[in-house]
Amino acid sequence: AHAAWKDAESDFIGILRMWNALQPFRDERGKWRRNALRKFSTASYLNMRRVIEWSNVVDELADAESAHLKRGSGKDAAEIAYPYASIHRSLLAGVPRQFGLWDRENKAYRSASGGFFAVFPGSGLFAAPKRWEWVVAMELVETSRLWARRMARIDPEWVEQVAPHLCRSVYGEARWDEAQGAVYGKERVVCGGLAVVMGRRVHYGRVDAKLAHGVFVREGLLGGGLRKRGKFLDFIDELREEVGTIEDKLRRPAGVWDEDAVVAYCEERIPQEV
């Protein structure tokens, strides 16, 4: 009887569908038509008393929201179009550690703590045509194995948005970008044992100014990555040519010129703000 409300992406959308299916059994004042509700509940294997208790909680929350925001309750819940992302970011904020990444080898979801959990057979996601890569689980119940109940597909970047205090960033691959005239790198955001953001492009000067300055000198200034050449670079080229001539005479190719020393010389004299 509940199969009509199930959703392959989210058990919470299934709950919302159930709620919306109950709304026609209210009168124009919002009161329940109990006889009709009782028949529907019996046919749908729902507990009418629990339905009414659920309704009371929803009404109390709506009143509290209206009082807090100092506005009317607005549209009836059944009339509102609920954005998937907004609903599930809110749910994820309540259980920010209870998310997982599908592990094909183990055929289960790897959790942020390093363990594994499986989709509970009663979930709408159990019979879904595909396994969603990332999910949140509102309930984790351990019996013969750790089962996830009340699940939903999520975007891993939502973890960083709702729980930045649980995330840490790892940076690398700093490179000079000639088109942008700056040093850029890659950011990886990790929560627990799972990377929720991979390869996000970042301005490296805001991450590690000293390292970015070194990349600028080596790749941008001395590596020919600048759009405009200054007289200083002409001097360096002339000096490199002169040293090359000396190396040829001494039969010591690349034995006199020290690129690292030149880089260190430039780093010492060019301010990091440049």
What are these regions (language model features)?
Residues A1-A182, K210, G214, I236-A264, ...:
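Second RecA-like catalytic domain
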Residues A174-L239, G244:
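GHKL/Bergerat-fold ATPase module
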